Design a protein with these regions (language model features):
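Short, charge-rich amphipathic alpha-helices with coiled-coil/heptad character
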Residues: 1-5, 19-60, 85, 91, ...
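Amphipathic alpha-helical coiled-coil segments
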Residues: 54-65, 107-125, 174-175
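Long amphipathic alpha-helical coiled-coil segments
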Residues: 67-79, 114-139
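Coiled-coil termination/hinge junctions
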Residues: 146-208
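Short cysteine-rich clusters marking metal-coordination/redox-active sites
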Residues: 206, 232-235
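Short Cys/His-rich local motifs and their 1-3 flanking residues in nucleic-acid-associated proteins
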Residues: 211, 234-237
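Short, non-ligating residues that shape and space the ligands of small metal-coordination modules
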Residues: 215-216, 241-242
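Short linker/helix segments within small regulatory modules
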Residues: 221-229
């Protein structure tokens, strides 16, 4: 393959731009905000799970308190009715009077026990409510951090995308001046060789694989016409000759 020396030099410009695009793409993928958002999102998910559990406990305990208070009210109402019967003299026989007094005493103890249960449930409900409030605040805090990190990530991506668009446009302009067959070979080699399809020959060393060429290869390149497209015998990349090639 033949190409004018100037076209081969421009191929190095295309290569430089492709390297820059690779660097920008890597930087885009490696923004610290990506890992930060991922970590915060995991934290938020765990906290939301804890919050749901705490809210469930809160609602269950609230229902338990309502039931305990209803039990107290029922016992209190029954005791009030018995006391009213006692006060009204409705219990006329000694046995009825004794039974009524015994039931009033039993209900008073039952009411006391139930009121203790209500107090215990109220304490658990208060604790559950505090837990819900704490977790709600923590979820909001983490969500705020996620939003902040997302805003920073989006701003960084916007800046990088702008630079990528600019470099891509510049590559299009320069690559349009490179012969199609040379550019096709370059793109093929670039895909095969980790993003580097053309390299400068500097002081008899290929800048693609960093290997110094054998003297026989140097002699062949020295003897080749200026418009001959030469390849590195080590890595097979396109070698571009310049005044610094050491030929």
């Amino acid at each position: 393959m033949n190409a004018a020396p100037a076209d081969q030099i421009r191929l190095l410009d295309v290569q430089d731009l492709d390297v820059r695009l690779q660097q920008l793409a890597h930087k885009r993928r490696s923004l610290p905000e990506h890992a930060e958002i991922e970590s915060l999102t995991k934290d938020a998910t765990q906290l939301r799970d804890l919050l749901v559990a705490a809210q469930t406990e809160e609602s269950d305990t609230a229902r338990e308190q309502t039931k305990a208070e209803q039990d107290v009210d029922q016992v209190r109402q029954r005791a009030a009715r018995d006391q009213q019967r006692l006060d009204s003299g409705a219990a006329t026989s000694p046995k009825d009077l004794e039974n009524l007094q015994r039931e009033i005493t039993s209900l008073a103890k039952r009411q006391g026990d139930l009121e203790d249960i209500v107090l215990e449930v109220m304490e658990r409900l208060e604790s559950a409510q505090e837990r819900v409030a704490e977790l709600t605040e923590r979820v909001a805090s983490v969500q705020s951090k996620i939003e902040d990190a997302t805003a920073r990530r989006d701003a960084a991506l916007e800046s990088l995308d702008g630079e990528i668009a600019s470099v891509t446009k510049e590559r299009e302009v320069i690559s349009a001046t490179v012969p199609a067959d040379l550019l096709k070979l370059y793109d093929k080699l670039r895909a095969q060789q980790g993003g580097i399809g053309a390299a400068k020959l500097y002081q008899r060393t290929c800048q693609g694989c960093r290997q110094e060429l054998a003297i026989t290869d140097i002699n062949e390149i020295r003897a080749a016409a200026p418009d001959t497209v030469v390849r590195c015998e080590n890595c097979r990349r396109i070698l571009v000759r310049t005044s610094e090639s050491g030929l």
